[in-house]
Design a protein with these regions (language model features):
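Sec-dependent N-terminal signal peptides
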Residues: 4-13
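Cross-family detector of peptidyl-prolyl cis-trans isomerase
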Residues: 15-280
Length: 280
């Protein structure tokens, strides 16, 4: 199984565990100094008139096609986005269309993507439609990513910020966003049974300190397990097979002032991306 390249990975895994991120090539004018987006059926690919542009000291460039009337995006917000990522030659390397989804939720500030994403999104507002140039140093850098993203490649992100998500559960220091729930009416997780899940976990300082997808080894947990902090218990209670949820758990519901060894520092907030595989 390929390593994670994008926020799309859990969605692709849910559809087909053996299928990774694909890439699609479209033509570019060889004399152009800017990325050329061809006209297709999707709004992200249509030509648009720029109404504003900013270049930041860190190398990020943002071109606005539409300025939204919603609130400014801040650290910890979860927003629904419609997006595609291209290389300079217009090769598409990422996008929600790969999973046949109209949008994908993105949690700002917790390494769901490269550092450039987290920085750029904090310059946007709900309703913005933009193209963002993410320099390689804030993307995949010198390493690139396998045969998908070359070394030292800038990324060009075309994105519509559709809305800010409201938590499905908000309790104390825990905010849970239910991304998907199957109609399957199976056993629900509680104090007496066992839950099997795929899990990604990050803090602002430690990207994916837990990643069960990497070696395809799901986690099995019981209610009273030491790893199960209060935020996980609140969010996983009554969850069932097929549920996909995002969590942002503040220190008081996570590991508090003690942290969790070298994984979670004192008073750190934790982001989780969880796919429930089975409840037994």
């Amino acid at each position: 199984m390929k390593k994670i390249i994008s926020i799309l990975f859990p969605f692709l895994f849910a559809c087909n565990p053996s299928e990774g991120v694909k890439k699609e090539h479209v033509q570019q004018d060889q004399d152009s100094t800017e990325i050329v987006i061809p006209v297709t059926e999707t709004i992200l690919d249509d030509p648009h008139q720029a109404i504003d542009q900013k270049i930041y000291p860190n190398g990020i460039e943002i071109v606005w096609f539409q300025k939204g009337k919603g609130a400014k995006i801040t650290l910890g917000d979860v927003v629904d986005i419609d997006y595609k990522v291209r290389l300079r030659d217009s090769t598409i390397v990422d996008g929600n269309y790969l999973a046949k989804l109209k949008s994908i939720p993105f949690a700002v500030g917790y390494h769901m993507q490269t550092p450039g994403w987290d920085l750029a999104f904090q310059e946007l507002s709900i309703g913005d439609f933009v193209r963002i140039k993410i320099p390689s140093k804030l993307g995949r850098g010198k390493k690139g990513f396998e045969d998908v993203i070359p070394a030292n490649a800038d990324n060009y992100l075309t994105v519509r910020v559709l809305k800010k998500r409201i938590p499905s559960l908000s309790s104390g220091g825990t905010h849970m966003y239910l991304v998907h729930s199957d109609t399957f009416q199976g056993k629900r997780f509680n104090e007496k049974n066992f839950l099997l899940m795929h899990l990604l976990a990050s803090t602002q300082k430690n990207r994916y300190f837990t990643n069960s997808y990497e070696k395809n080894k799901p986690f099995g947990v019981q209610w009273k397990d030491k790893y199960m902090n209060e935020g996980l218990r609140k969010s996983l209670k009554n969850r069932k097979k097929g549920d996909h949820l995002l969590l942002i758990v503040a220190p008081q519901d996570a590991y508090g002032a003690k942290g969790l060894g070298q994984l979670v520092g004192p008073n750190e907030t934790i982001f989780y991306d969880i796919q429930v595989l089975e409840v037994i």
